[in-house]
Structure formats: C-alpha cells, structure tokens
Regions:
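Short, surface-exposed patches at the edges or C-terminal ends of soluble domains, predominantly
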Residues: 1-239
Length: 239
C-alpha cells in the first residue's frame, strides 16, 4: 500500500498489515490478526506531518533487547536511529535519547556526551528516557549523572506483586489523552524514582500502590517488610 501526500510518500509492506505466526504443521506463516488500521494510520501521519521527531537509542553498554520499543516508536511516527555512544556523538537533530537497560556502567567520555546533548548549548529542550536494568549497583557513574539532573532510582518492594507492579496514572496533562484510564498499567520489575530537585518541569507520570516500599539493598535473604516499610505510593515514571 502506497500512501502519498504532496511530495512525501510512505510504502506499507504487506507484512506490516497483518500479524502472523509459524504453523509447524505446514511450515508456513499463518495470518492471525490484522494491524492494517494501525499501520496505515501511522503512514498517513508520517506523510502529512511537517516535522517528525528523531529519537536516538544509545548503545555500546550491553543494553537489553529494545526491538519492541523501536517498533512501537516507529509505528507512532518517530524517526528512530541507533547511536553507539562509545564511538559516536548523539545526533544533534535528535530531540530524544533513550538509554535502555544498560548492562555496564557509562565511562566519563560517554557521560560528557550525554551532558552536552542535554545542555544543548545551554538552550536545553532535549529529553532523555532512562530505562534501568534490574541491577542498579552495576552503574554507579550513570546513577550519579542522573542525580545531577534531578532524579535517582532505587529498589521497589510491592507487597502484592513482587515482580509485576500495578501502577496508577498521576499527571492529568499526559493521562488526559488515554481513552480508558481504568485499565491498570502493569510494570515488570519496576524501580522507584526519587525526585531530587523541585521543578515545575518535572512531572510524575506513574505511581505504585500504597502497598509498596523501598527494598533495602543490604536486606537479608527472606526479608519481609514491616507495615512501616510500606510507604507507597512511590514514583515509577517521571518526565
């Protein structure tokens, strides 16, 4: 399917119109459902938009698989590019950089590139999305850098779901576009966020339930929280 508007066009492949899975009885792919509306709508937005936001996914530190994130961003009309921050600069025309669950700590050279990107010649206006991994102690330098920009992460304990946390929407400006806010947000192995600087530009997006608290880093095996340890709700996502 070719979508065209003026001088811009977008080709939607047949594989982008349907969901399919392998049939091991026939050793061929079988269509299971349609995603045509989503794909065609995304293409229409692409060719009619005056500006497309560029996203740089930062690599070079043994990041977790981010293919699902890339697909979601692409479907929603973002121009997604990879940038190995150990060897390359972050693209100047990128509005957003993403660090997706790095397995190793950032060195000073990479942190300087991050700072240069976010400072943007003192004009600011850039954004960084940080998705932490499950081992925060592996990245002390990156954690220190994030603290300088006003946020830090910790360990979360949820009294009802130790691995999957039920989160609730907070900021109305962001949640107002959601059709059905009664559908809960489920976050796997979520990490609490502490806002270190008071700022009107920092918005809390998601919070944990009241039955949650901070899991001590030095907790003994089999640790169970007291009622006083459950200090929720706790910030799980902020911008």
């Amino acid at each position: 399917v070719l979508i065209k508007c003026g001088e811009k066009h977008k080709l939607v492949k047949s594989s982008e119109l349907f969901n399919s899975e392998m049939s091991y009885s026939t050793f061929s792919y079988v269509v299971t459902s349609s995603k045509a509306e989503q794909s065609v709508t995304s293409a229409m937005v692409n060719v009619t938009s005056d500006e497309i936001t560029k996203v740089a996914i930062l690599t070079g530190y043994d990041e977790a698989d981010y293919s699902s994130l890339t697909s979601m961003l692409t479907r929603n009309n973002f121009d997604v590019q990879e940038a190995n921050i150990t060897t390359d600069e972050i693209p100047e025309d990128a509005k957003l950089a993403v660090i997706f669950a790095p397995g190793r700590d950032y060195d000073q050279s990479s942190l300087k590139k991050l700072d240069t990107f976010l400072s943007n010649n003192e004009k600011l206006g850039k954004s960084l999305v940080f998705v932490p991994n499950t081992q925060p102690d592996q990245i002390p330098e990156l954690n220190s850098f994030l603290e300088e920009w006003g946020m830090s992460t910790d360990h979360l304990y949820n009294n009802t779901t130790p691995f999957w946390s039920a989160a609730e929407y907070v900021d109305e400006d962001y949640s107002s576009v959601i059709t059905n806010k009664s559908i809960p947000v489920s976050v796997m192995q979520s990490r609490p966020i502490e806002i270190l600087k008071e700022s009107e530009s920092i918005k809390v997006l998601l919070e944990s339930t009241e039955n949650s608290g901070i899991y001590p880093v030095d907790a003994a095996e089999g640790w169970q929280p007291e009622e006083s340890d459950l200090t929720g709700p706790i910030t799980l996502a902020a911008v």
